[in-house]
Amino acid sequence: MKGIDNTAYSYIDDLTCCTRVIMADYLNSDYRYNKDVDLDLVKLFLENGKPHGIMCSIVPLWRNDKETIFLILKTMNSDVLQHILIEYMTFGDIPLVEYGTVVNKEAIHEYFRNINIDSYTMKYLLKKEGRCHQLSR
């Protein structure tokens, strides 16, 4: 993947209303020839992927392919996961928590038990006091 700045870059296709580009298209089983995800190929995407693009690539899979998401999340280091958490909480035009998004309490519990908690993530969560707003990019 040399020469590609962000293999997880994604955008919403106006014609199909789907999240598109390299990693998102590969993870979407409608575009993939082989129905099984090649984890080695995904690792190559993740090496050059930026947290926002990774988050945009995996969120659309949540309803239909949680198993693939769990495999992907297991391959990432804690720093990238924490950046993805911040991106997820601040993603979109609607402040997720303010409009009633339910956070999986078990996942949050596991996050706070993590010995590798990033102080910047904690500062962000405490500063927002449970409120999330769109960050300017």
Curated annotation (Swiss-Prot):
It comes from the Viruses. Keywords: Early protein. This is Uncharacterized protein 15.
